[in-house]
A protein has these predicted regions:
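Terminal domain-start leader segments
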Residues: 1-276, 280-365
C-alpha cells in the first residue's frame, strides 16, 4: 500500500484539511477526483481524493464538512471503498442511492459556506452544487483566484507535477500531418465566425499536434492547454522541460510554446481584444470560462472543435487498429493455451491469471 492511500494517515490528513478549510472561512469543501483537464486518469500530484480519503478508484467525489464527511462512489467501487476509506470518518454513499447534491442539501448547515476549486469542476457541476447549497440555505463559494487548494496547502509530501518528455506521433500512424489538422480546425472556426478556441482536453491537443506524452497512467497524453485561432496559430501552455529540440522542430513556427503560468494572462488578452472564443462547457474547468467572461471575451459555448474530426479515423489509423487487434488476439490465444495447460494443476487465481495475460500482452506490444 502506497503512502497516498494508507488508511492510517487519513485521520491526520482530514484534521489538517479541516483546519485549512476553517482558516479560509469555509465550512466545507468539495473534493472531486478530477484534475484541471477533467480527465479520467490524473497524475500523482492531482490525486487529491486519494490523499484526503484513501480511495484510489478512478471515479468518485468527497464532501468534507467541519464535523462530518461523505464519499460518493458508483457500484464498481463499493468493495474498494469499504477496504480503503475509513467508515468512521466518511459516510459511504453509493451514487445509485445518494447523490452529492442530495447529501449536501440535507447535511450542509444553514448559512454555511461550501468551498470548491473552480479548476476542478465544470460549469454544469458548479450549477448543480449551487442549487444544492441554495436548497440547504447555504452558499457555494469558489476559492479566491490567488488561493491555493486547501488540500495542496497541507499536503506536505505532494509529488511534483509530471515533466515527461513529449514525443512525436509520426504522420505514418496518424494519417495526417498536424499542419493538415490545424488547417481543418482553423477553417471550421472561421466558417463559424469564431476567432479562437481554448482547448483543455489533453487528448484533443495530442491529436491536433501529433504529439504524445507520459504524464498520466494508461493514456499517452501531455498535460497542457492550448489556444488555437482561426488563422491557424497555436499557443501551447506546457512546462518547457517537456520540450526537446526535435519537438520544437516538429511544431515549427505555427506553435508558440509558453509556460503554464501565462495561461491566465493569455485568456485575459482574448478579452482585451474582444475575441469570440469557443469553449466546451462540458469538459473545460469552470475557472477557464469565468476568466474569459471576466476579461470581456464573448464565450461561444460548444463542442471542442477537435472532437469530431478526431473521431473520423484515417486509413492509417484503421490499419493501426486492425494491427493492434491482431497482436492482442495472438496474446489472448497464448494466454488461453497457457490457462488450459496450467489450470488442471490448480493454484491459479484471478489475480495471477490477469498478471499472466498482461505479461503476454506486453511481450507482444
Amino acid at each position: 500500500m502506497t503512502q497516498e492511500n494508507n488508511a492510517s494517515d487519513v485521520p491526520v490528513r482530514l484534521r489538517a484539511l479541516r483546519g485549512e478549510i476553517e482558516r479560509l472561512g469555509l465550512d466545507g469543501f468539495i473534493v472531486p477526483r478530477s484534475d484541471e483537464h477533467q480527465g479520467e486518469y490524473v497524475a500523482p500530484s492531482s490525486e487529491r481524493l486519494a490523499w484526503t480519503s484513501g480511495f484510489t478508484g478512478s471515479a468518485g467525489l468527497a464532501v468534507v464538512l467541519r464535523d462530518t464527511a461523505a464519499i460518493f462512489i458508483d457500484g464498481r467501487y463499493t468493495l474498494q471503498a469499504e477496504a480503503e476509506v475509513p467508515l468512521g470518518l466518511f459516510h459511504h454513499c453509493p451514487l445509485n442511492d445518494v447523490t452529492p447534491t442530495s447529501w449536501i442539501a440535507k447535511n450542509l448547515p444553514t448559512g454555511a459556506k461550501l468551498g470548491y476549486d473552480s479548476w476542478l469542476l465544470t460549469p454544469g457541476q458548479v450549477s448543480r452544487f449551487q442549487v444544492a447549497c441554495k436548497n440547504a440555505g447555504a452558499e457555494l463559494t469558489a476559492l479566491a483566484p490567488d488561493a491555493a487548494n486547501p488540500i495542496d496547502a497541507v499536503w506536505t509530501d505532494r509529488p511534483a507535477a509530471p515533466t515527461s518528455k513529449v514525443v512525436i506521433h509520426d504522420d505514418a500512424f496518424a494519417g495526417q500531418s498536424f499542419a493538415e489538422k490545424l488547417k481543418q480546425v482553423a477553417d471550421d472556426l472561421k466558417a463559424q465566425k469564431i476567432d479562437t478556441a481554448v482547448l483543455t482536453q489533453t487528448d484533443s491537443i495530442a491529436w491536433l499536434l501529433n504529439i504524445r506524452g507520459n504524464d498520466v497512467p494508461f493514456t499517452p497524453v501531455v498535460l497542457t492547454f492550448a489556444i488555437i485561432d482561426a488563422d491557424g496559430g497555436v499557443d501551447l501552455f506546457m512546462d518547457g522541460r517537456k520540450l526537446s529540440p526535435e519537438i520544437e522542430r516538429h511544431l515549427g513556427s505555427a506553435v508558440r510554446c509558453r509556460e503554464p503560468d501565462s495561461f491566465g494572462d493569455a485568456l485575459d488578452q482574448l478579452g482585451t481584444e474582444h475575441k469570440t472564443v469557443r469553449l466546451d462547457p462540458e469538459t473545460a474547468a469552470a475557472w477557464v470560462g469565468q476568466r474569459l467572461k471576466t476579461s470581456g471575451a464573448a464565450v461561444n459555448a460548444g463542442d471542442d472543435p477537435c472532437q469530431l474530426p478526431k473521431a473520423r479515423k484515417t486509413a492509417a489509423q484503421l490499419d493501426g487498429i486492425r494491427a493492434a487487434h491482431r497482436r492482442d488476439g495472438a496474446s489472448l490465444t497464448r494466454f488461453l493455451a497457457w490457462l488450459e495447460a496450467e489450470a488442471p494443476h490448480g493454484g491459479i487465481t484471478e489475480a495471477s491469471a490477469a498478471d499472466k495475460l498482461e505479461s503476454l500482452r506486453r511481450d507482444n506490444d
